[in-house]
């Protein structure tokens, strides 16, 4: 008003009607890039890979760890995606990097989540033991919220492509693991 504009109730109503007719959302989601200090946070996920071991095609599961700060990636191959493989992969990773990060981030995997109670997720006994032994915390991502754990989602595909795009045939699982 102080700059000479004329504002009326009917003019404001007309403007609101035009905006609604254009189907312009009143608010849009915004994402803030997270910062994680080095070694503080690591994301975990499983991925599948089909390899030929001794001439026979087999399916393996890759346990992939990705540091949130550096995108440093580590992976191990397993025949099963079960609790034993989950715990063994963590032991391998923590030995490899010389300790455990402060926070491990998981999606909604059965080996980490025992049950859902409303929006809350209860950890499995294996995850509780792992967390207590290595003195690291854990966090679960929300369902269908890939931005909460985006590093490792891309890392599974990255590791699979870089490690196994040229060579798919190995004499043993150990040979395939060495390729990683």
What are these model-predicted stretches?
Residues 2-14:
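Short, basic interhelical loop/turn and adjoining N-cap
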Residues 3-6, 22-23, 93-102, 133-137:
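Secondary-structure transition/capping motifs at alpha-helix termini
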Residues 10, 17-73, 81-88:
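Mobile-element integrase/transposase regions
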Residues 75-103:
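Active-site beta-loop-alpha junctions of metal-dependent nucleic acid enzymes
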Residues 100-119:
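Acidic/histidine-rich, metal-coordinating catalytic segments
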Residues 119-138:
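Two-metal-ion acidic nuclease core segments, chiefly of the RNase H-like superfamily
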Residues 135-180:
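Charged alpha-helix within mobile-element recombinases
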């Amino acid at each position: 008003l102080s700059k000479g504009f004329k504002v009326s109730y009917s003019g404001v109503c007309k403007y609101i009607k035009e905006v609604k007719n254009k189907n312009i959302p009143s608010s849009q989601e915004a994402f803030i890039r997270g910062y994680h200090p080095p070694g503080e946070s690591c994301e975990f996920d499983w991925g599948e890979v089909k390899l030929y071991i001794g001439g026979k095609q087999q399916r393996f599961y890759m346990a992939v760890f990705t540091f949130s700060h550096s995108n440093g990636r580590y992976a191990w191959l397993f025949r099963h995606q079960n609790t034993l493989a989950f715990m063994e992969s963590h032991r391998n990773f923590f030995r490899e990097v010389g300790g455990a990060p402060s926070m491990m981030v998981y999606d909604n995997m059965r080996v980490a989540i025992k049950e859902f109670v409303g929006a809350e997720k209860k950890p499995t006994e294996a995850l509780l033991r792992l967390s207590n032994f290595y003195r690291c915390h854990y966090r679960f991502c929300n369902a269908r919220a890939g931005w909460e754990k985006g590093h490792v989602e891309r890392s599974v595909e990255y590791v699979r492509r870089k490690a196994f795009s040229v060579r798919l045939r190995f004499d043993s699982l150990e040979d395939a693991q060495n390729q990683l």
